Amino acid sequence: MSEIALEAWGEHEALLLKPPRSPLSIPPPKPRTAVLFPRREGFYTELGGYLPEVRLRFETYGTLSRRRDNAVLVFHALTGSAHLAGTYDEETFRSLSPLEQAFGREGWWDSLVGPGRILDPALYYVVSANHLGSCYGSTGPLSLDPRTGRPYGRDFPPLTIRDLARAQARLLDHLGVEKAIVIGGSLGGMVALEFALMYPERVKKLVVLAAPARHGPWARAFNHLSRQAILQDPEYQKGNPAPKGMALARGIAMMSYRAPEGFEARWGAEPELGETYLDYQGEKFLRRFHAESYLVLSRAMDTHDVGRGRGGVEEALKRLRAIPSLFVGIDTDLLYPAWEVRQAAKAAGARYREIKSPHGHDAFLIETDQVEEILDAFLP
């Protein structure tokens, strides 16, 4: 039997039909935080900003092999966290920040990580870190600026996808990992692409789900509207949180994450419930994410262009041909259409697979049976 469940799927919370969870699970995860760029070194961003110190919040599952050859690095989407899998025990949950608690106890890709699952910790050393600029334990706008003792807030420097990839590479150094299978979806897929181009010698295999090689005008338009909803909130303009703006930003984003087929199937008989659903998602989003991190990361997405400084997108993607790569599109994705992902795969000489789903962009988080089947045919 299946059950209707309201789940926090990392970037996107979705009301969906979810299969019952397997009784086989991993031990309760323990999040950790590492200083990767200490004050004596600092972190200079691609756009000329400076952070005196950079920390990343991360979780690991499994054990690094003696040969250090079984690592899998998973990058989360825009509003995701390091909490990839497992369920926090009560002690760990109480130690989390309010935003982390609001994110939830269960990991955002829990159905893919565990005994007998595609990312089995008995076989792999799985690493998941919260991106630089986010609000779930990594250095971001909520962090204290060591120079002032106050949160960075709106003074946090602008980031690019390449900055996010560089921070993640330093985490692998910290963990003693030389090479890894690299997997990412949506924003995480953009980071995965940049990671592979910046550090090709560190990538055993590359998996890009529902992500483009360049953030084009259509996707940027959605981000622009979401940011404007926040920036135009009168409370935000007074220097306060932006509750109405954040709720509206989430609603705008949700429309790009979903597809007409899914809305019609669920709410065709009662269309007003679709509106209620968007309102609910907006209200819930206020409790689990921060406006400044949303602005920083969405702007970073808009900088994404693998061809920048590399002779154009196609020339850049050709550099990936030495890396076994898999690109996964979604047939109903409005945000990053399947043709866009397919085109990138062709230029990279990569395999291409497509998820069939009425759920749009969110399908890479929802259709985990299909994702598992696709990964099973590609991973060692």
Swiss-Prot record:
Family stated for the protein in its record: Belongs to the AB hydrolase superfamily. MetX family.
Protein name stated in the entry: Homoserine O-acetyltransferase
Catalytic center residues: 186, 333, 361
A Pfam family assignment: Abhydrolase_1
Functional summary from the UniProt entry: Transfers an acetyl group from acetyl-CoA to L-homoserine, forming acetyl-L-homoserine.
Pathway(s) the chain acts in: Amino-acid biosynthesis; L-methionine biosynthesis via de novo pathway; O-acetyl-L-homoserine from L-homoserine: step 1/1
Source organism (scientific name): Thermus thermophilus (strain ATCC 27634 / DSM 579 / HB8)
Keyword terms of this UniProt record: Acyltransferase, Amino-acid biosynthesis, Cytoplasm, Methionine biosynthesis, Transferase
Enzyme nomenclature, EC number: 2.3.1.31
Subcellular location: Cytoplasm
Gene3D superfamilies registered for this protein in UniProt: alpha/beta hydrolase
